[in-house]
Amino acid sequence: MVHLTGDEKAAVTALWGKVNVDEVGGEALGRLLVVYPWTQRFFESFGDLSTPDAVMHNPKVKAHGKKVLGAFSDGLAHLDNLKGTFAQLSELHCDKLHVDPENFRLLGNVLVCVLAQHFGKEFTPQVQAAYQKVVAGVANALAHKYH
């Protein structure tokens, strides 16, 4: 559960309505894989991840980034029940994929940076603070199965 004020929730929702999930998802996941290269081990089936350019233009990275942000969008619609919303994904990432839950926090922070780049002055300190709360809540929900 994420505790947002009415203004924070409105800001998150308003900005998210402008997000191009295809573009931002691929960019966020790609940046995660470039900046934190050890995360690439979970995506060996994606083909060439040998250079930053290869990662950022990899169609499988873009497609999975879109899928990730689709799940994130679902979380935004259920901010009062993030653990329930992400229960199956938490189980999958814990039991089958064995993803270090710290990676969820890293991806959330990368997503905030990508949003800041895309929205510039519209991504005010208040909007950024609200998104930090949301990505922390999502990361916590995804890590829930690990506890």
Curated annotation (Swiss-Prot):
Alphabetic keyword roster: Acetylation, Heme, Iron, Metal-binding, Oxygen transport, Phosphoprotein, S-nitrosylation, Transport
N6-acetyllysine PTM sites in chain numbering: 60, 83, 145
Protein name, as recorded: Hemoglobin subunit beta
Membership in a protein family: Belongs to the globin family.
Domain Globin positions: 3-147
Modification N-acetylvaline, positions: 2
Protein's GO biological process: hydrogen peroxide catabolic process
Disulphide bonds in the chain: none
Tissue distribution: Red blood cells.
Cellular component GO terms held in the UniProt record: blood microparticle; haptoglobin-hemoglobin complex; hemoglobin complex
Signal peptide: none
Residues given in the record as heme b binding sites: 64, 93
Function description: Involved in oxygen transport from the lung to the various peripheral tissues.
UniProt xrefs under PROSITE patterns: GLOBIN
PTM sites of type S-nitrosocysteine: 94
Recorded name of the encoding gene: HBB
Modification sites for Phosphoserine: 45
Phosphothreonine: residues carrying this PTM: 13
GO molecular function: haptoglobin binding; heme binding; hemoglobin alpha binding; metal ion binding; organic acid binding; oxygen binding; oxygen carrier activity; peroxidase activity
Oligomeric and partner information: Heterotetramer of two alpha chains and two beta chains.
